[in-house]
Amino acid sequence: QHIPHFYLKVVVEAKKLFELYKKTKSQIPCSVNDFVVMACAMAIRQFPAFRSQYKNSQIIESENVNIGVAVGLDDGLVVPVLVDADKMNLSSLSARTKVIVENARNGKIDGMGKGIFTVTNLGMFGTEEFSAIINPPESAILAVGAIREDIKVVNESIKATRLMTMTLSVDHRVIDGVMAAKFAAAVKEILENPEQLIK
C-alpha cells in the first residue's frame, strides 16, 4: 500500500440510532450498517471530494455515489458496491445490500472498480474501534465499531447512553484534514439525528 493515509476518529452518540433501528427492523429487515451507509451517502453529496478516485496520479471525480460494503469471506475481504447509494431509501438499500453480499459469498462481486468510498463494520464481532486500509482507487474508508452501552454526564446527572466509534481513513493526496473532519462531523450529525434517514 502506497496510499498516504490520514486517520480521524469520531464517537457517535447512538442511542437514537439504536432505538430507531429496533423500531424499523420490524417493518424493514435492515441492519445498523444500512443506516451508516445511508448517512455516508447523504454526507458524500455535500462533499464532492469524497466522490473521487486516485488513478494514474490523477484525481478523478465521479458523478455517482457508489459505496462499497466490505464483506468478510473465509479467504479474505471483498468489497461489492452499491451503485447510486444516495438515490435509495432504507428499504431498497437494505434489500440491495443483502443481494450484493450474497452474490459476493457466491463469488460474484457487484460494481467491481466503481466504488468511491467503502464502509467496513466489525461491530458484530464486538470490536469497538479499528482503523481500515483504503481500498484503491477509492480515496476514503469508514471503519465502524460496535454500539456499546455507556454513561454520560448531563447537568451533573449521570445518564445511560449508547456510543459507536467510527474511524475515517482518507487518502491525503485527495482529501485534506479539514475536509475529512467536516465530513466525519456531517456523518456523525446525521447518525445522531437519524429520523432524516427514513423520510
Predicted regions and their residues:
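C-terminal catalytic/motor cores of large multi-domain enzyme assemblies
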Residues: 1-199
